[in-house]
Structures are given as structure tokens and as C-alpha cells.
Amino acid sequence: MFVGTNRIKIKKGYGKELEELFRSRGEVAREPGFVDFELWRQEGDPEHEEYLVVSRWESEEHHNQWLRSDSFKQAHSGPPTDYIMGHGEFSNYQIRLAYQAEK
């Protein structure tokens, strides 16, 4: 499984706006190979808010196809938001080991 992350720093007090922005971008759920999406918020930084966008894909190729898709272009074509600080920090991972709770 392939995981893409994007670390985004925003001005303090704009977390709800960023969350709503991602809430309105559900088109990725229809993309081939898409597994799931999570938006994580870091706690405790007094100077800014930090989020980690996490998307999981069946393969890196599925992720790359999405990056070239019309839905990706649409999701990233809106006006710039002035509360985002700089550019996101992208990272990619391959899951090598995972555990689940025993029931």
C-alpha cells in the first residue's frame, strides 16, 4: 500500500477553514485505487496550526494517476488561501508492517 502525506502549516485560528476546505473535496474518493483519507491536526503549537493530510492508495501508480487527473486539478484550482503558510511538505511512504487490535 502507498501512502502520500502533505504537512500544511496555517495561521493560528484558521483550522476550521482548512478543515472545511478538505471536507468539500470528496472527489478523490471516486478515483481508481483510492483507499482512504485522513486529516490530522497537531496539538499544542502556540505559533501556528499544523495539519497532516494522509491519503492511502493501492499503489504508487494509482496515486500518480490521481495527480494527473481532472479531479486533482479541480481540487487545487481555487483561489489561494492567505492563511496557509508557505508550501506543503510532501512525503511518500510504502507500508511495510501494520497491526490491528486483537478481538
What is the predicted role of each segment?
Residues 2-8, 38-68:
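Short, well-ordered beta-strand segments in beta-rich or mixed alpha/beta enzyme
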Residues 9-18:
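Short, surface-exposed ligand-recognition loops at beta-strand->loop->(often short) alpha-helix junctions
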Residues 20, 24-35, 56-91:
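An amphipathic, aromatic/His-enriched active-site/gating alpha helix that lines ligand/cofactor pockets
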Residues 15, 30-32, 46:
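A cross-taxa feature marking solvent-exposed loop/turn segments within ectodomains of secreted
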Residues 2, 38-49, 75-103:
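Glycine-rich beta-strand-turn "strand-cap" elements at beta-sheet edges
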